[in-house]
UniProtKB/Swiss-Prot annotation:
This is UDP-N-acetylmuramate--L-alanine ligase. It comes from Macrococcus caseolyticus (strain JCSC5402) (Macrococcoides caseolyticum). Cell wall formation. SUPFAM superfamilies: MurCD N-terminal domain, MurD-like peptide ligases, catalytic domain, MurD-like peptide ligases, peptide-binding domain. Belongs to the MurCDEF family. Its EC number is 6.3.2.8. PANTHER family: UDP-N-ACETYLMURAMATE--L-ALANINE LIGASE (PTHR43445:SF3), UDP-N-ACETYLMURAMATE--L-ALANINE LIGASE-RELATED (PTHR43445). InterPro entries: Mur-like_cat_sf (IPR036565), Mur_ligase_C (IPR004101), Mur_ligase_C_dom_sf (IPR036615), Mur_ligase_cen (IPR013221), Mur_ligase_N (IPR000713), MurCDEF_pg_biosynth (IPR050061), UDP-N-AcMur_Ala_ligase_MurC (IPR005758). One of its GO terms (biological process) is cell division. Transmembrane segments: none annotated. The keyword Glycosyltransferase does not apply.
Length: 431
């Protein structure tokens, strides 16, 4: 039996893929840095071994799956090559894996993880669907007909995939350490559409997506009347958001999602469109949509005393704005307190003023030091450069989280793609 060894198993995509292979009966282990990540708990609960990086982890007969963050000079990858083992990059392995299913890629600059989670949940309401979500969640179901997966545009990794369908949520400038400009980002998505086999489902309210050209049908969804699939008559209730869906100008049905915010309705429209194209039972789709509980680190809520604590992955100005708007919609009577940790110096520099403007939607802002990525450990920029752009913003770390106690009955949101969770944990552990 093949033993799959994951180099960088704690990465969100890597851990999800490890779950999938394990669920399908494969033997799986992996290695990573010793720092704790939110993906670890579920891996360990399945009995999947997680080792610290060491070339001695690599043995004869293993198949190596390497995370995209680790170069060929990594000690374990070097050792694998010395032993003549097959080393496959995450995105290449995933590209080959999906060929056995009717596959749906979910991509876009924002909203990939939430939409993939929703898609997998809703499709499973009618058809067996295996899935890989960017929150570290994955499920390999024997006998699955469908495979729903998150496809990241970073470094054009999504060009390794040839899915049957693709959902594109939006196109926005991000990853300034790789993409040179907005046109560079657009060109990457344009390249990706050429790899899709059956159809593209895209947000027609996004002007950039209207410029996409494809040799297959593009089904546009959104709030504007010129889309094929349109959401109308939205109503916000304590239970979520209700909306009507029109297809080609005709009322299709009324749906309810437990989520809040325009972006959540757009995500739902994308999923409804895919299910409609594939002929899934609409009653099952409606029920599943109404029972969606969200995904990890995307508006993940818990109650502590009188406060609502929210953990969210938002790390781009567009995402921060959407998260804060959702909080105000769901809890209109409460103050919203934002604790934000910028992720990467390059992104912070590129979007400095945009970060400041989006964070101003909060009633109070606290900032953490910038979190550098594996590829970028330092920069000339400091968190003070962002702080001065936000009136009343203060700095916070694990030693002064008691500052948050003063906001009785508030919504306290911890946002970022780094290790912002350590701030929330420190706050929750206050005596």
């Amino acid at each position: 039996m093949t033993l799959y060894h994951f180099v960088g198993i704690k990465g969100s995509g890597m851990s999800a893929l490890a779950h999938i292979l394990f669920d399908m009966g494969e033997t799986v282990q992996g290695s990573d840095i010793e720092k704790e990540f939110f993906t670890e708990k579920s891996l360990r609960e399945k009995g999947i071994t997680i080792l610290p990086f060491n070339q001695e982890n690599i043995k004869e007969g293993m198949t190596i799956i390497a995370g995209n963050a680790f170069n060929d000079d990594h000690e374990e990858i070097v050792r694998a090559h010395e032993l003549g083992l097959t080393v496959t990059r995450y995105h290449d392995f995933l590209g080959n894996f999906m060929s056995q299913y009717t596959s749906v890629a979910v991509t876009g600059s924002h909203g990939k993880t939430s939409t993939t989670g929703l898609l997998s949940h809703v499709m499973n309401g009618d058809k067996k669907t295996s899935y890989l979500i960017g929150d570290g969640t994955g499920m390999g179901m024997p006998g699955s007909e469908y495979f729903a997966f998150e496809a990241c545009e970073y470094r054009r990794h999504f060009l390794s995939y040839s899915p049957d369908y693709a959902i594109i949520t939006n196109i926005d400038f991000d990853h300034p350490d790789y993409f040179a400009s907005m046109s560079d980002v657009f060109n990457a998505f344009q390249e990706m559409t050429k790899k899709v086999k059956k159809a593209i489902v895209a947000c027609g309210d996004d002007e950039n997506l209207r410029d996409i050209e494809a040799d297959i049908p593009i089904y546009y969804y959104g709030f504007k009347e010129d889309n094929k699939v349109v959401a109308k008559n939205m109503k916000t209730t304590p239970q979520g958001t209700q909306f009507e869906v029109y297809i080609d100008g005709e009322l299709f049905d009324t749906f309810v999602t437990p989520m809040y915010g325009d972006h959540q309705v757009l995500n739902a429209l994308a999923v409804i469109t895919i299910c409609h194209l594939e002929g899934l039972d609409n009653a099952a789709v409606k029920h599943a949509l109404s029972t969606f509980g969200g995904v990890k680190r995307r508006f993940s809520e818990k109650i502590q005393d009188e406060q609502i604590l929210i953990d969210d992955y938002a790390h781009h100005p567009t995402e921060i704005k959407a998260t804060l708007q959702s909080a105000h919609l769901k809890y209109p009577e409460r103050k919203v307190i934002a604790i934000f940790q910028p992720h990467t110096f390059s992104r912070t520099s590129a979007f400095l003023e945009d970060f400041a403007n989006s964070l101003k939607l909060a009633d109070k802002v606290y900032l953490c030091d910038i979190f550098g990525s594996v590829r970028e450990d330092s920069g000339e920029l400091t968190i003070g450069d962002l702080q001065i752009l936000i009136p009343g913003a203060e700095l916070i770390n694990e030693s002064n989280v008691n500052l948050l106690k003063q906001y009785k009955d508030a919504v306290v949101i911890f946002m970022g793609a780094g290790d912002i969770q350590k701030i929330q944990v420190a706050y929750e552990n206050l005596k």
